[in-house]
Amino acid sequence: MSRAHAAYANEGWSAPEGGIAGKDGSTRDCSGYGSQGPLFSAEEEVKGTVVRETVGPIEIFRYADATDRVLMIAGTAFAVACGAGMPVFSFIFGRIAMDLMSGVGSAEEKAAKTSLIMVYVGIAMLIACAGHVMCWTVAACRQVARIRLLFFRAVLRQDIGWHDEHSPGALTARMTGDTRVIQNGINDKLSQGIMNGSMGVIGYIAGFVFSWELTLMMIGMMPFIIVMAAIIGSIVSKITESSRKYFAKAGSLATEVMENIRTVQAFGREDYELERFTKAVLYAQGRGIRKELASNLSAAVIMALMYVSYTVAFFFGSYLVEWGRRDMADIISTFLAVLMGSFGLGFVAPSRTAFTESRAAAYEIFKAIDRVPPVDIDAGGVPVPGFKESIEFRNVRFAYPTRPGMILFRDLSLKIKCGQKVAFSGASGCGKSSVIGLIQRFYDPIGGAVLVDGVRMRELCLREWRDQIGIVSQEPNLFAGTMMENVRMGKPNATDEEVVEACRQANIHDTIMALPDRYDTPVGPVGSLLSGGQKQRIAIARALVKRPPILLLDEATSALDRKSEMEVQAALDQLIQRGGTTVVVIAHRLATIRDMDRIYYVKHDGAEGSRITESGTFDELLELDGEFAAVAKMQGVLAGDAKSGASVRDAKKASGHLGVILDEADLAQLDEDVPRTARQNVPIDELAKWEVKHAKVGFLRLMRMNKDKAWAVALGILSSVVIGSARPASSIVMGHMLRVLGEYSATKDVEALRSGTNLYAPLFIVFAVANFSGWILHGFYGYAGEHLTTKIRVLLFRQIMRQDINFFDIPGRDAGTLAGMLSGDCEAVHQLWGPSIGLKVQTMCIIASGLVVGFIYQWKLALVALACMPLMIGCSLTRRLMINGYTKSREGDTDDTIVTEALSNVRTVTSLNMKEDCVEAFQAALREEAPRSVRKGIIAGGIYGITQFIFYGVYALCFWYGSKLIDKGEAEFKDVMIASMSILFGAQNAGEAGAFATKLADAEASAKRVFSVIDRVPDVDIEQAGNKDLGEGCDIEYRNVQFIYSARPKQVVLASVNMRFGDATSNGLIGQTGCGKSTVIQMLARFYERRSGLISVNGRDLSSLDIAEWRRNISIVLQEPNLFSGTVRENIRYAREGATDEEVEEAARLAHIHHEIIKWTDGYDTEVGYKGRALSGGQKQRIAIARGLLRRPRLLLLDEATSALDSVTEAKVQEGIEAFQAKYKVTTVSIAHRLTTIRHCDQIILLDSGCIIEQGSHEELMALGGEYKTRYDLYMSALS
């Protein structure tokens, strides 16, 4: 059985050897990394691991401030003092044991004094143990928060070229996963290691004081232990970093999928993406298992050598007593001191492993923090008080860093004067947007120079230069927050009045005021709750509120209908005409650049790169009658300024209102007519927390999920039983050995001494073998746990992809938070399985076997100890419950959301100089979390200290009561020693269980967050079987369809819509931005479910159809084309797995992109970059169109599919789409703001405020003389 089986156990999936099978029975090969190319480089595959450095043991604390250093110093002092407790105890124990064996005086009187000293030691341990946990936990929280902040700041500081090579998903995985590893290595786990290490050192020092000869003999094995620890530590470090790197790739993949979830679902690629993700996490799983086995091998060797040393110690100790060199008290004190010291050193291993892992995890993070980018926003430079003269490109040679062999500009020279209005025109992919990028200094040219006011841009203060620039990009990026907050990002200190005025100019004010919450309306993650046009107008308002000296407009109005475009263009013209504003425009609609002072026509000549072939005013270029004039004629744009104020006034008159707002009575009536579920009644802002609260997580559930690895858990439990039972059992041998030594002190019987030593000392070899075997088997916990982690990660990822789009609109369910779940939370759940079972079983065995031994040898003493156990266990449980109370507050992960959103929109963050704003928001989220972390550390430390005090108190009580029994003749010294030591081990392990409470509490909170998603059944469920008989053709009808977004429950987006899309017909949807056009398309893709009414396909209710089958018959091209990291070929083939190269190329020809692709150096194997960053907007859109056409669907949905294209290219693409439709008899539904695009549709539907106001063919609507005719005439007047 392959490892992939584990990922689907008990969840309705099977994974036969060599592949992953979905519910449909189809099997996919898992030998590679899907079709997206190899997961790792050939060099990495050959090596079998990723060799990586670690930071130094001191360097990892480089970001500690004075407070942290004081806390760490104090915590270290407390830890050392805590470690001294057991050696001090060994001295007291040896003295009182000698006194009791001597038979002189009252045993009870002597024990009372010793017990009182033990209580004093317990008080000291309370302070010391609480202190070291508190100090190190708080210091770690503070440092990791600072590291996260610095890493985030450093990542945002990096140049765009660096970001082109580092996906946001991988960076987010480092932020969430690796920083947790760092914290786990430098928190109280490290102080536990210091405590255990000091116990070892002080124990050995005490041993040398009591008997240097015996101590030397006992520590003879130490060189072997040290060498073994060093070797294993190095191996674990390399394996850990390898695992981290592999999962960083998996995290990047997952983030990209979640950000492009509409594309994934529309093309039914959930199984494919699950396969890719599974492949990636299986790599990480393999390394994780190796790490667990290596760590347990280290522990096995160390513990075995320790027990071997006990055999040697008792043999040699007996001779020292016989020779009169030492008495029994010295031997007992030495043995216990070195014994506890050895145990202390043995317990250093987990802390050492965690510390090593943290140093490995810190390496890449610190490397990023230290990196000084070549284009550095934080660097100084020549001040830029304003823009006065010009921007000059002087012999610029440029290639993108990700494609250094593909020269874009070989010798670009041009000058943009201050106050000048300049436009760039040309076919898609010719380099227009690259000019915009160079002006913002996203990149530096590889030759020549860009000068500002005669100064090289490299020498300017970059931050001040970007402050001079306002930009609206082709694909506007918004941020989670309100309308007001997003507009104000353009000018953080803008007043409300300035924001409102900017929104008026951008023609979005009336839309905002029609919403229930107005300017406080949330836009959703990356603006997901807004239409494309609304997002673009918000982005325009964001640029306008800044009133910048330089305004860059990269297809700023491409997503707007003609009315909105004219209104916004008028506002932009007013801004331009105020004077002093330098404007650089990229626009494919030549009518919008008619008034430019200068227009540059750019042409791309394949391998020769791009160059300016024509330049001049609009009229001059028409007179030139070159390539620009040919495009202008194609668009119907004539010389002269035909745009009039009347046109703009007509546009304003034609504007409709947006939205139908429901009052409480309407909502109540709607809920009565169409009942809502309990989940749907929860406010969307509270929904994530509500789902976490109702999540059910239990140990039995985890056991069922991992039942195929029950054998490994059984071996692990066997190891816990062996290890747990060995400790109390060894106390029997020790007790008998001490009796032999004590009797010799009284009788001087050498023969009895020899025979007793020969009988009992070799028994420690048995314990050595048992412990070695036990710790080796203990590694199977890690084996099972790693498999469980992989299963949960795969299951969570699968369930995330299963959710409907409504899920991703919920606050706290964005890609960043979900990526954090896949990384950190799933890893934390591991603790509930392997380590949790091991600790519980081991603790139970130690306590149970200790009590059994105690009852056998002295039942009265065992009863006293048993009566004290609830106190210790209760204290540990209290600590765990209190910590758990603070971990619940982690739900939400605001910091993860901020990180993912900022990194996904890094170009916008860079353009708007928002780095410090994002850092401040992230810092505020960290600051909000800090008090909870500190309180958790203080509580954890306090209760841990109390636990240790109770341990010493219980032992003092047992010791005093045992002496009382000796005085009464009811017990022998041997019985008291055996019972006391066996109970001591049980009590000590109970304390260790308490120390583990923090991690378990965190793991439980993580598990609830994870299972709140795993258990969620979406309203539109792809796994719900439906009718697979779709009928013939594709005839669609909407009957009284009403739709409301859950994020805006009072706003009706579609109000009782009735329409029909006939089979094999072409249908166009037009209307003002935000009127519901995209909603119609997204409902057809089953992204959202209607609120009421009926949508039918060939007479069948769409909601009754099998979703997977339905989506196999549709294809969609969204307004913002979502591409994936990989090659051009892979992205086109994404729509239809198994398509031949010929079919891919044919689809590319229809989308008019084939001839461009074959001119690229790597052709169809050209990497497109994260989200297609390596391509222009038009190139991305055409590849997305090719992908859609390759599917050969019954229904083709086009949402502004050609908005980023120039008119020449658009016309050719439109020809390809029409030819495709005619050939395959496809039903098409198109949204377009360019009315010429849909003029030839069989049916055109005009929507306004969620209602249909007109519908019919172009000729019918023109004859009607209504709203459509007004809009069409307005559109054509702008082109004439």
Swiss-Prot record:
Subcellular location: Membrane
InterPro entries found in the cross-reference section: AAA+_ATPase, ABC1_TM_dom, ABC1_TM_sf, ABC_transporter-like_ATP-bd, ABC_transporter-like_CS, P-loop_NTPase, Type_1_exporter
Residue stretches making up the ABC transporter domain: 391-634, 1036-1274
Alphabetical list of SMART domains matching this protein: AAA
Gene Ontology biological-process entries: oligopeptide export from mitochondrion; response to antibiotic
NADP as UniProt keyword: no
GO CC, alphabetical: mitochondrial inner membrane
Protein's name in the database: Multidrug resistance protein 1
Organism: Leishmania enriettii
Gene: MDR1
